[in-house]
Amino acid sequence: MTNKNKWGNRMKIAVVGAGIAGLSCAYRLARSGLDVTLIEAGPYFGGHSNTVDVALDGVEFGVDTGFLVFNDRTYPNLIKLFDELGVATAPSEMSFSVKLPRAGGRTLEWAGANLDTVFAQRANLLDPRFLRMLRDILRFNRQASAMAHGGELPRIALGAWLDEQDYSPQFRQWYLLPMAACIWSCPSDQMLAFPLSTFVRFCHNHGLLQVSDRPQWRTVKGGSRNYVDKMVAAIPSRRLLAPVRSVLRGTGGARAVRIETGAGFEHFDHVVLACHSDQALALLGDARSDERAVLSAIRYQPNRAVLHTDASCLPARRKAWSAWNYQSSAAAAPQVCVHYLLNMLQPLPCSTPVIVSLNPIDAPDPAKVLAAFDYAHPVFDQAAVAAQARLAQFQGEQNTWFAGAWTGYGFHEDGLKSGLAVAASLTAMMAGRQHAAA
């Protein structure tokens, strides 16, 4: 394939951001023989695919602190990529528990693995509010499944729809919002503003609305760095600790995109902004009104991830320990957090509980803290979903492309899909020029 601009120079493409979107875009462009440079501001490639080494029980091994699992039904591009790279995976699970305060200083604990864990606290067998919650779960699954199969979904926020349908407070606070917090890493008020249609489609696609025939969840053996390293090795021109300060686009001509880093200015023919939408907007010194409207419409929830071995954050009853463990505080505006029990998510060679706590309410024992990281996740309210639909209107204009998980549901497959789509568009553009020149 020819890789020249219309002035006969070799076409240069910059990909800014080395999360799954940037990695996949740069990897596919490099494999296609194009001149691509991957530029990452941080100290490692991978973004939320962040594997760190720990030493426990006399063994040193890697654990993941961001991206953890995928399934065999809704991650087709990721599965294809892992097959292409020869990445080994192992079975994982999606068990879920809830731990939150009740009146009188009591604590509610339950988990969804089986009837024994649902009624981990036997008193709940006689609690009418708990039993109402269970009935509401079954009702919600029926209603949401019917909507998912019925075509057009109501344009309404999740919280407003729950009010219309008279779902109990216990269903919201003890089940639906905890489950959503585990999935989207955001607080309750943000989830209630989530578009009902997006929520229902996601739950349906991921098999969350039925007890049987759920997808099999898997994880990368040895940690997600095993796939990241293989992708990075296929990208000859790559840079770490190289934060981009600004991106300016010219009105035409070769190398019309000017990128500023700490090392100075560099010119490219195309730029792919494979970072969060707010970061992309901050880099565009000459952002147009349509770009500004879309990129500014998506908000982000900052999340602190603490890697530790303090099991006191998990349910008091060990039978309720799950892969994903939700906890909330007793405040009027309760704090929420999720504790990911990595021993149940990944095949770890140790018996010591290894936990990633997202926004922990109670700080883990400092002597048991292994590391801490800051992540951010997109907030999918009505404004964000509307903005996503407008991205295609200017994708590729002024030789500027946008990619990231924020263009979909916010998950790994979404970031990968967006990066591959941009790479395919650029590759097709080059092929079209080759055909025109022939």
Sequence positions of predicted segments:
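Mobile amphipathic helical/loop "lid" adjacent to a hydrophobic cofactor/ligand pocket
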Residues: 2, 72-196
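N-terminal Rossmann-like FAD-binding beta1-loop-alpha1 element of flavoenzymes
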Residues: 11-38
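Conserved Rossmann-like nucleotide-cofactor binding loop
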Residues: 21, 44, 278
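Glycine-rich FAD pyrophosphate-binding loop
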Residues: 30-55
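Mid-domain catalytic core of redox enzymes
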Residues: 32, 245-376
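N-terminal glycine-rich dinucleotide-binding loop that anchors FAD/FMN and/or NAD(P) in oxidoreductases
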Residues: 52-78
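Conserved flavin/dinucleotide-binding core of flavoenzymes
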Residues: 53, 113, 333-438
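Helical element adjacent to the flavin cofactor pocket in flavoenzyme catalytic cores
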Residues: 201-261, 266-269
